[in-house]
Amino acid sequence: MKLTNYTDYSLRVLIFLAAERPGELSNIKQIAETYSISKNHLMKVIYRLGQLGYVETIRGRGGGIRLGMDPEDINIGEVVRKTEDDFNIVECFDANKNLCVISPVCGLKHVLNEALLAYLAVLDKYTLRDLVKNKEDIMKLLKMKE
């Protein structure tokens, strides 16, 4: 399964913020430049992450963004489920769009559904804290001050 850029960027933003010193504010420009991602895309991602409570946005002079909850409370499987818009990895997963003639007897959709559930189950085992255990290395690569 391939994650959308939206989910990829969401996870990267969370990793970036988790690698920051606790309470430190970051900004969209800084994250966009670090990852070479469009600021416009990141604004949408960060807005949604804020709605979900994963990030806190502080407006105005001296404002910025930071994690809205502890990294150990941010489950990766949950983030993926909330940022991916479509888990229909094959046509037959969507009853409204399914035109496959063998769908009623096909075993493939059951195998793929099992694989999708296993994929999500693995993601459910991890939190954001798990992804930043090597925080010092991440900070160096992101060129953050320790």
Swiss-Prot record:
Quote the DNA-binding region ranges, renumbered to this chain.
Answer: 28-51
Keywords, in A-Z order: 2Fe-2S, Activator, DNA-binding, Iron, Iron-sulfur, Metal-binding, Repressor, Transcription, Transcription regulation
**Known role:** Nitric oxide-responsive transcriptional regulator. It represses the expression of flavohemoprotein hmp and the nitrite reductase nasD. Probably plays a role in the up-regulation of the resDE regulon in the presence of nitric oxide.
Chain positions recorded as [2Fe-2S] cluster binding sites: 92, 100, 106
Entry's SUPFAM superfamilies? Winged helix' DNA-binding domain
Under which name does UniProt file this protein?
Answer: HTH-type transcriptional regulator NsrR
Q: From which organism does this entry originate?
A: Bacillus subtilis (strain 168)
GO annotations of cellular component type: cytosol
| Cofactor(s) required for function per UniProt | [2Fe-2S] cluster
Q: GO BP, one example?
A: regulation of DNA-templated transcription
- Which Gene Ontology molecular-function terms are recorded? 2 iron, 2 sulfur cluster binding; DNA binding; DNA-binding transcription factor activity; metal ion binding
PROSITE patterns, per database record: HTH_RRF2_1, HTH_RRF2_2
| Gene3D superfamilies tied to this protein | Winged helix-like DNA-binding domain superfamily/Winged helix DNA-binding domain
Location of the HTH rrf2-type domain: 2-133
Q: Explain how, and how many, cofactor molecules are bound.
A: Binds 1 [2Fe-2S] cluster per subunit.
